Curated annotation (Swiss-Prot):
The gene is aaeB. The lineage of its organism: Bacteria, Pseudomonadati, Pseudomonadota, Gammaproteobacteria, Enterobacterales. One of its GO terms (molecular function) is transmembrane transporter activity. It is found in: Cell inner membrane. InterPro entries: PHBA_efflux_AaeB/fusaric-R (IPR006726), PHBA_efflux_pump_AaeB (IPR023706). GO terms for biological process: carboxylic acid transport. Forms an efflux pump with AaeA. Could function as a metabolic relief valve, allowing to eliminate certain compounds when they accumulate to high levels in the cell. The keyword Transport applies. This is p-hydroxybenzoic acid efflux pump subunit AaeB.
């Protein structure tokens, strides 16, 4: 059998088993709505598969399941608090629920992307509980407990199905990606030392940026897979920092070569020009480079020496990750040498727009439902909250909303066939019911791995509109209300995204660039504790977001890279201890923070001019302290860079 077909069939079987097992156990334990367990199993297993375009890693499935449990608990708690405080005022209760959904979406847009699902789920879980139980508020505590139980059952069934069908470990992919990343780092160094075209260097750098980010995502999946991988997980965090450092130092070498300050010649240049295509060749090449560097260290540029040192640390950590052995004393010193600085979100305005979309959409929908008494209103409201909560953090919310809409349109005829022909023919047989649902899930599971538009939405929507409750009833009007309500909810969500436009792209890009300016100035310090802080992961995270926002804007990309390189250069400077210089550092950091957080262009320009003035004064203080020429030159280079790009950073 074709190697690409077998994993798809395996995942389709895994998905079918998870959905059928959760449904059967839900009926076996006499739960009131077993479809919630089946729906949870489908979403937790199929969501990562749709993103990956194939059989997802076990850690990704478990991570998704854990996030769903946490989000459900938070949402149930929020629903109970809202009910207890406003049970005598139904309209106020629904408005508070809409406000809760908007706040949760706002928070989900500020946290890390991999954790945003928790708060998005918490928002619409409270909406589901309150809207579904609005007619009988006294039953809401029992309703919340049942929902939590059924969701936990669905997640347990997904994990069991994953274990039955050979869980896919991410470890081998991590090992291959780490070797490939080091090879790419060396090829970037070759381009920066040689005379490669600027576009070629940018393309290589961009590829390394995405590879390093991908390994960061694998790191989280590896820990969720098993606690056995914790030593490798710890090493990977520092290994990523070494990767950022090697990229930065290679870029600094390229800038120095362009300015004529970095000349690599002789045997070292000949060695660097030799092509390297395999990890084995790379190891031999690096050994020879270190041997030459040890004998000619005084004549080599400092960034090249730093790059070789970082590559040695990278190889040591990579070997430990490969074997997952106990962390040695030398590795402990590397792990504890620096303190990574966490990046704060630069998408505050974007997050506010996302929360506003969800809050306004659900509030208007609730008022319309209450005024008209529309029979499909509750389902429409739930779908409106679900879509607006889940798609906002995605790179293209409009396309994701269209995917939901297409899925609900597919679910109408598919669900009608299942509801009116297939399910009644099972004659209340749990075995036949499981077989029918399993076959449907198997077919859709194959399409999900192809990332077919509407496939994931079709699976979730079809399971949701089928009356998989205990006891099962076949009410055609209720089925049509649910199906039509889902479609109208998706249409309204799509309309909300189109009407409430997000114009924060330019503002977020400017904020990211000014955060990079602040990071560059953070490299100036005389305090040992501050010098140990590693800002590179946070700075490259800002750069990655900037590339996603402006994929074709090479001017912003190169400015951001230049600021990161300047930060690394300033961080390596040996600035003498002085109260005057330390006070200058504090003032410049404070002013740079004001530039990044300024509300308007006028205020930002004023703070930026103040920052340039402070940097000129700082250069004068450096001259008075008779510091080394390289320190003065590095500060002058940063000042010139800011003056040259003042328009891009302020307007």
């Amino acid at each position: 059998m074709n190697s690409s077909v077998f994993p798809r069939l395996r995942f389709a079987c895994k998905l079918s088993l998870a959905v059928v097992l959760s449904l059967v156990l839900g009926f076996w334990f006499e739960m009131e709505t077993p479809r919630w367990a089946a729906l949870t199993a489908a979403i937790v297993a199929a969501g990562p598969a749709f993103v990956a375009g194939g059989d997802p890693f076990s850690g990704a499935i478990r991570h998704r399941g854990l996030l769903r449990i946490l989000g459900t608990f938070i949402g149930c708690f929020g629903a109970l608090v809202i009910i207890m405080t406003t049970v005598r005022a139904p309209v106020v209760m629904l408005m508070l629920c809409c406000l809760w959904a908007g706040v949760c979406v706002w928070i989900s847009s500020l946290v890390k992307t991999e954790n945003s699902y928790v708060f998005a789920l918490a928002g619409y879980t409270a909406l589901i509980i309150i809207i579904t139980s609005q007619s009988s508020p006294r039953a809401i505590p029992q309703f919340a407990i049942e929902r939590c139980s059924e969701i936990i059952l669905g997640i347990v069934c997904v994990i069991l199905a994953d274990l039955v069908f050979s869980p896919r470990s991410v470890k081998q992919d991590v090992d291959r990606a780490i070797d490939d990343l080091l090879l790419g780092q060396y090829q970037l160094l070759q381009r920066c030392v040689g005379r490669a075209a600027t576009d070629d260097v940018d393309s290589c750098w961009h590829g390394l940026l995405r590879k390093t980010q991908a390994i960061g995502g694998m790191r989280n999946i590896l820990l969720m897979e098993s606690s056995h991988w914790q030593p490798a997980w710890r090493r990977m965090k520092t290994l990523l920092s070494q990767s950022w450092m090697m990229m930065t130092l290679a870029g600094e070498i390229g800038l120095m070569r362009r300015d004529g300050d970095c000349v690599v010649k002789g045997g070292l240049l000949m060695l660097l020009e030799q092509p390297v295509t395999t990890p084995g060749d790379l190891r031999r090449q690096l050994r020879q480079l270190r041997h030459l560097a040890a004998s000619h260290s005084s004549r080599l540029p400092a960034p090249l020496v730093g790059w070789l040192a970082a590559s040695s640390r990278y190889q040591l950590l990579a070997a430990g990750i490969r074997t997952n052995a106990r962390i040695s004393q030398r590795e402990t010193e590397i792990l504890e040498a620096e303190t990574p600085v966490r990046a704060s979100s630069a998408e505050t305005h974007h997050a506010l727009i996302n929360g506003l979309r969800t809050g306004v959409a659900t509030a208007v929908g609730c008022l319309f439902w209450l005024l008209t008494g529309w029979t499909s209103g509750s389902v429409c409201m739930v779908m409106l909250g679900v879509v607006t909560a889940l798609v906002m953090r995605l790179p293209n919310p409009l396309m994701a909303a269209k995917d939901f809409l297409i899925g609900t349109l597919i679910a109408l005829p598919l669900g009608a066939v299942m509801f009116m022909l297939v399910l009644p023919a099972t004659q209340q047989s749990l075995l036949l019911l499981g077989l029918c649902i399993g076959v449907m899930t198997f077919v859709i599971g194959i399409e999900i791995q192809k990332r077919r538009l509407g496939s994931l939405g079709a699976l979730a929507s079809t399971i949701n509109i089928l009356v998989l409750d205990n006891p099962m009833t076949f009410n055609l009007s209720q089925f049509l209300d649910n199906a039509i309500g889902q479609i109208i909810g998706c249409v309204l969500a799509l309309a909300v995204i189109m009407l409430i436009r997000d114009n924060s792209r330019a503002r977020t890009g400017r904020t990211l660039l000014n955060r990079l300016v602040h990071g560059a100035i953070d490299g100036l310090s005389t305090r040992p504790a501050r010098c140990r802080e590693n800002h590179l992961p946070a700075l490259y995270q800002h750069l990655f977001l900037l590339i996603n926002l402006f994929p074709g804007d090479m001017a912003k990309y190169r400015l951001a890279l230049s600021l990161i390189i300047v930060h690394q250069r300033l961080r390596q400077l040996d600035i003498p201890l002085s109260d005057t210089l330390a006070e200058c550092h504090r003032q410049m950091r404070a002013t740079a923070a004001r530039v990044a957080g300024a509300a308007g262009d006028t205020q930002r320009s004023r703070y930026f001019s103040q920052l340039l003035t402070q940097m000129e004064e700082y250069r004068q203080h450096l001259g008075e302290h008779q510091v080394a020429d390289d320190i003065v030159a590095a500060v002058a280079r940063l000042t010139a860079l800011l003056q040259r790009h003042q328009h891009a950073l302020c307007d």
